Amino acid sequence: MNREDPGPHVAADDPASIDREALATLNRVFGYPAFRGPQASIVAHVAGGGDALVLMPTGGGKSLCYQIPALLRRGVGVVISPLIALMQDQVDALRELGVRAAFLNSSLGARAAAAVERAVVAGDIDLLYVAPERLLTPRCLELLDGVRLALFAIDEAHCVSQWGHDFRPEYLQLTVLHERWPQVPRIALTATADAMTRGEIVERLALQSARQFVSSF
């Protein structure tokens, strides 16, 4: 599918339309016949403008939980990911499907990064993957100030836990997303978070109003 057409852009207050377009996007873009487990509920909640915390095992289809809402909502979906290699793999896979995806991280030279920034401003990107340290730069924050934002997805959200092996201090600063863009929905995702870590994610990312979706392992 060619994503030059920016997609259906459903109304947040029309649950039936969201459900219908979400399933159509799953079929048409990603080639799956049906959602699995809580995916449909998560997609509908975030596409409708709600915040979410998603705990789902690796291989459970976490990525679709933010990719589809990003395609349904107007603007660019911004995905914060700490893993450069995974970022590249996700963007490559999305481009193969015809989704307009790009990334900003330290692997890009200045010219390549500027080209991505121009594409974002032009409205030519549906999903932008950003390393947390890049997101927090004044240049990137100002870039996002100038465009319409569909959502923020915070992947590997357990990196916010100061007690965990994967702690990333930049994640503690991601409250800026809510402070700077309070109307933009946020979805935090992780495959490894016990109840204590989930509480820490909620507190440190200011997700007190987020609906929690906890899948069994």
Language model segments and positions:
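ASCE RecA-like P-loop NTPase motor cores
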Residues: 2-12, 44, 96, 123-125, ...
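Conserved pre-motif I regulatory segment
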Residues: 10-57
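Conserved nucleic-acid-binding Ia/Ib motif block in the N-terminal RecA-like helicase ATPase lobe
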Residues: 23, 77-79, 84-137, 200, ...
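Pre-Walker A (Motif I) flank of P-loop NTPase domains
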Residues: 48-54, 75-76, 124-126, 185
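Walker A/P-loop
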Residues: 49-68, 78-81, 190
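Conserved hydrophobic packing residues within short motifs/helices of P-loop NTPase cores
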Residues: 55, 78, 102, 151-153, ...
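Conserved helix/coil segment N-terminal to the catalytic DExD/H
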Residues: 60-63, 67, 108-151, 159-165
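Post-DEXD/H (motif II) to motif III coupling segment of the RecA-like Helicase ATP-binding lobe
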Residues: 145-215
